Amino acid sequence: MTSNRHTNSNWLKDYKSKLFLTDTQKEVLIGTLLGDGSIKISVSGKAARLQICQSFDYKEYVFWKKSIFKEWVLSGPKYYKVNNSLIFRTVSHPEIYKFYSKFYKNKVKIIPKDINDILKSNLSLAVWFMDDGNGYQHMDSYRLSTYAFGYEGNLLLQKCLLVNFGLKTNLVRDSRGFQIYVPVRSGDADKFKKLVMNHIIPKMRYKFRNTSPVETDLTK
């Protein structure tokens, strides 16, 4: 239950004024925005909140993310039976709005043109994979589901992965759009795994297995 003080506007205003995003929180936020996370803008248009939505099957991952943003989250996660999901939201804040202004255009998530300056850490890469990646037997690759970002967005991501992480990837088109694949045979999949493995929580390590792709995104 939310404490009464959390609904007190003066207390909340003072509480928010003391918040700032740590480097770790920024890195997790970046990976989350490339994956399943979304940002909701406030009524004022000057602040925004991060929303995390995942299947209840991945509750350990949800609670891990909440632990990262613990001072930003005043309640939840809340269970929604209709789609068997867990959702939590941060407080609205100008710091998160900065990421909204980068990753959204006309309320639609995009890839910023300066993504090379944003996606630079192995932690961000790992969170992106935990959100929207998996091993894909048919393509003998690790797959990053990037349908939402269109051709141009995928090209920006592909270049970023090469420049910042030394990863050569394939851009593959199917009936739904474009996705990024990190091939096994070239050795890039092994390189990718070494970059992210220390940041993958135990519950999500199954994603390295070669399986048919399973969509877990409940927010798009």
Predicted features and spans:
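Internal intein/HINT superfamily modules and their associated LAGLIDADG
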Residues: M1-K220
